[in-house]
A protein has these predicted regions:
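Long, charged, low-complexity intrinsically disordered regions
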Residues: 1-98
Length: 98
């Protein structure tokens, strides 16, 4: 089997931080809900999403997806110590039925 063409999923550790620097806005529609679901499975209820400062396209996409997700209680731009307007902090619901 050719290792370079392997379609095996890549496993990675879920943490309270998601760095989106390598993603395009069009890739976030599946990524963000999946990430939130995995965080809830790990009992992570406060997350930091790093979208960068740039022109704001990633930030706007992230905020739009957070607004639509019923598992998100609230969110805000991070304070300076956590990335300022280059990151967003979100609080997730503790309810397991959602």
């Amino acid at each position: 089997m050719d290792q370079e063409n392997s379609e095996e999923p890549i496993e990675f550790q879920i943490s309270d931080e998601l760095d989106l620097h390598t993603f395009r806005p069009s890739e976030l529609g599946d990524l963000m809900p999946d990430y939130i679901g995995l965080c809830l499975q790990k009992n992570i209820f406060r997350i930091r999403i790093i979208h960068g400062k740039g022109i704001g396209t990633l930030r706007e996409t992230v905020h739009g997806l957070l607004r639509k997700d019923s598992r998100v209680l609230r969110f805000k731009l991070a304070d300076q110590a956590e990335g300022g307007w280059g990151a967003t902090i979100a609080w997730l619901t503790h309810a397991s039925s959602i």
